[in-house]
């Protein structure tokens, strides 16, 4: 006989470990265990059978994989946590004894840890880090807009804001912005970096009330990890673009208007990126080839001629037949006779339509418009920005320079006011939404709908469902509404005519119906007598007739509702589904039906509104 198997030595009981057991095994506090799990990406698991995993107990506990906890035993950060625990005891003892000098020495040599090796473990390739960049950006932008409180220091907020501005400066310089959406929560942006779509949310800079039930220890742990990750990513991106990281900050501009203009991006050669960018744009717009001198052209033609003669001699030596067929060689004309120049078209650095959308425009942004949003968006699309706030600061600090400025080159003025009293000739006045909608569509939309004081068209999310309700389909809706109105009018006229005919023929039909009812009663009485003579009940005959009628109705319904080949294939697929798949399919169909009903409801409301507007115009 084999040995009796011991309890809780295999299966769920061995594969899973509770949080209390894990803390005892690692010999750390609960707070350090949470930090370690966040850094390493280890999260609780749900076993199939909790009772077996907990060795027969049904108490609610948190489980982890035993292999994950065993993996944490060799983590260098865990050793630093233990060193910090010892350091805290020594520091407390020194302060208790009043040994200030020894306490200062201990504080200077406090154990420090880095998360660089963890970043390399969790993200072995650069694309893996880019794919997981959405949450870090959202967390950093959240903290950058938060006020300083007891649990969140000013330094943490300043560091988060600096990292966020480094990111925005890179995206705007490389013109990587593709889509954006202004929502209630904030502004959503999407950039494409090395083929990976990165989407993040920037909250509005409003006064915020911080809730008391938020555990900032966990959030700060995530922030620490995300800051390290974003530093890695930015260092790689800046280096690949030939830029110095971190970029230089212009303190004077930062104190004045601030914004992205205060972050000066410099190449590794020591040149300002703005000058290089201008040269690249000029080169992209006017592509010219390299001109060859006359001496170089003569040498090239002579070498070509000598090579041609040498080829003909070699061909003549190879021919052994007495008669040689003469062939006419192609004559290559010299392109320099027409003063032509060899050109080599260079690929443009900014290939997407949004990268050069505003490259020919200079925008003047009023003080009532959020500068941080529009500055980033316009610079990311190749435009230039002049803000009213910076002009006011320049007027106060340097009046001579302000007087020498030429503002005639401004093409667009962005304003969020109903009326503009003094308009400058030559400028196009628009509302901020014109910029956002142009970016989402990838082309310049009509300016007329976005003039100051006009009712703006709906600002839709570029990530919405394609089959959902589209309020912009105005022309299509109005055309359909007109067709339906005509059809409804025709149907109403036909119904009125039919009612008149029915009223006219009503008296004649009443007499016929009375006669038919009398005949039916006579037939029923005769059948009852026949059934009594035969010894059968009349109710059995009646039930049989009703059953035959129902069968006929079912046959007619089945013939009317003949299934198409696609519907038949769907029905066959449903038969082959499992119960789980059928439930999931029903849920999907319910969601699709709900969505279509919602779209139909909204389109119906839209048609009614269009009809009312049309009636008001006619009046």
UniProtKB/Swiss-Prot annotation:
The Gene Ontology biological process terms listed for this entry are: maturation of 5.8S rRNA from tricistronic rRNA transcript (SSU-rRNA, 5.8S rRNA, LSU-rRNA); maturation of LSU-rRNA from tricistronic rRNA transcript (SSU-rRNA, 5.8S rRNA, LSU-rRNA); maturation of SSU-rRNA from tricistronic rRNA transcript (SSU-rRNA, 5.8S rRNA, LSU-rRNA)
Give GO MF terms, alphabetically.
large ribosomal subunit rRNA binding; ribonucleoprotein complex binding
- Asked whether the keyword DNA repair is assigned, the reply is no
Q: Which UniProt keywords apply?
A: Coiled coil, Nucleus, Ribosome biogenesis, rRNA processing
- Composition-biased stretches, type Basic and acidic residues, lie in 523-539
Sequence ranges of Acidic residues compositional bias: 312-324, 480-522
Q: Name one GO cellular component term.
A: preribosome, large subunit precursor
Question: Can you say where in the cell this protein is located?
Answer: Nucleus, Nucleolus; Nucleus, Nucleoplasm
Record text on subunit structure and interactions: Component of the NOP7 complex, composed of ERB1, NOP7 and YTM1. The complex is held together by ERB1, which interacts with NOP7 via its N-terminal domain and with YTM1 via a high-affinity interaction between the seven-bladed beta-propeller domains of the 2 proteins. The NOP7 complex associates with the 66S pre-ribosome.
Protein name, as recorded: Pescadillo homolog
Which species does this protein come from?
Lodderomyces elongisporus (strain ATCC 11503 / CBS 2605 / JCM 1781 / NBRC 1676 / NRRL YB-4239)
The organism's taxonomic lineage, starting at the top: Eukaryota, Fungi, Dikarya, Ascomycota, Saccharomycotina
Primary gene name: NOP7
């Amino acid at each position: 006989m084999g040995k009796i198997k011991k309890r809780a030595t295999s299966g769920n009981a061995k594969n899973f470990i509770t949080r209390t057991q894990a803390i005892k095994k690692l010999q750390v506090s609960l707070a350090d265990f949470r930090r370690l799990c966040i850094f390493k990406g280890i999260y609780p698991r749900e076993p199939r059978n909790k009772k077996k995993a907990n060795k027969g107990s049904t108490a609610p506990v948190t489980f982890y994989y035993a292999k994950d906890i065993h993996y944490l035993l060799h983590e260098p950060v865990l050793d630093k946590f233990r060193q910090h625990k010892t350091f805290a005891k020594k520091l407390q003892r020194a302060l208790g004894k009043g040994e200030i000098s020894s306490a200062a020495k201990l504080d200077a040599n406090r154990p420090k840890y880095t998360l660089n090796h963890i970043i390399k473990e969790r993200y072995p390739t650069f694309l893996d880090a880019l794919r997981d960049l959405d949450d870090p950006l959202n967390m950093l932008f959240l903290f950058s807009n938060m006020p300083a409180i007891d649990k969140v220091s000013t330094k943490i907020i300043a560091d988060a804001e600096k990292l966020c501005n480094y990111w925005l400066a890179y995206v705007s310089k490389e013109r990587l912005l593709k889509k954006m959406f202004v929502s209630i929560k904030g502004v959503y942006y999407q950039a494409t970096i090395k083929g990976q779509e990165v989407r993040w949310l920037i909250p509005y800079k409003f006064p915020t009330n911080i809730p008391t039930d938020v555990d900032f220890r966990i959030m700060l742990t995530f922030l620490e990890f995300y800051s390290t990750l974003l530093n890695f990513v930015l260092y790689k991106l800046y280096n690949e673009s030939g830029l110095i990281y971190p970029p230089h900050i212009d303190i004077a501009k930062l104190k004045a208007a601030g914004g992205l203009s205060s972050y000066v991006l410099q190449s590794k050669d020591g040149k300002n990126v703005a000058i290089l960018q201008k040269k690249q744009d000029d080169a992209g717009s006017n592509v010219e080839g390299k001109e060859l001198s006359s001496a170089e052209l003569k040498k090239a033609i002579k070498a070509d001629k000598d090579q041609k003669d040498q080829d003909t001699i070699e061909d003549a030596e190879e021919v052994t037949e007495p008669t040689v067929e003469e062939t006419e060689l192609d004559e290559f004309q010299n392109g320099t006779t027409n003063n032509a120049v060899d050109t080599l078209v260079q690929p443009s650095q900014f290939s997407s339509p949004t990268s050069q959308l505003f490259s020919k425009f200079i925008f003047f942004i009023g003080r009532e418009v959020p500068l941080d949003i529009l500055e980033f968006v316009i610079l990311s699309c190749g435009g230039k920005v002049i803000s009213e706030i910076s002009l006011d600061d320049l007027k106060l600090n340097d009046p001579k320079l302000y007087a020498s400025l030429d503002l005639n080159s401004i093409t667009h003025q962005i304003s969020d006011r109903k009326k503009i009293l003094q308009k400058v000739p030559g400028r196009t006045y628009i509302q901020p939404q014109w910029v956002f909608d142009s970016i989402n569509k990838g082309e310049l939309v009509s300016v007329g709908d976005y003039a100051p004081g006009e009712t703006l068209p709906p600002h839709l999310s570029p990530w919405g469902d394609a089959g959902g309700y589209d309020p912009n389909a105005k022309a299509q809706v109005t055309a359909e509404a007109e067709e339906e109105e005509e059809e409804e009018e025709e149907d109403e006229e036909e119904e009125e005519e039919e009612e008149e005919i029915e009223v006219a023929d009503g008296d004649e039909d009443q007499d016929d119906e009375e006669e038919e009812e009398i005949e039916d009663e006579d037939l029923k009485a005769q059948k009852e007598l026949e059934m009594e003579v035969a010894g059968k009940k009349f109710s059995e005959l009646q039930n049989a007739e009703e059953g035959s009628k129902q069968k006929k109705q079912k046959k007619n319904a089945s013939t009317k509702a003949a299934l198409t080949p696609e519907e038949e294939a769907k029905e066959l697929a449903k038969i082959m589904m499992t119960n789980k798949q059928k439930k999931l399919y029903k849920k999907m169909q319910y969601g699709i039906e709900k969505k279509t009903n919602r779209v139909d409801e909204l389109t119906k409301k839209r048609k009614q509104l269009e009809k009312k507007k049309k009636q008001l115009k006619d009046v």
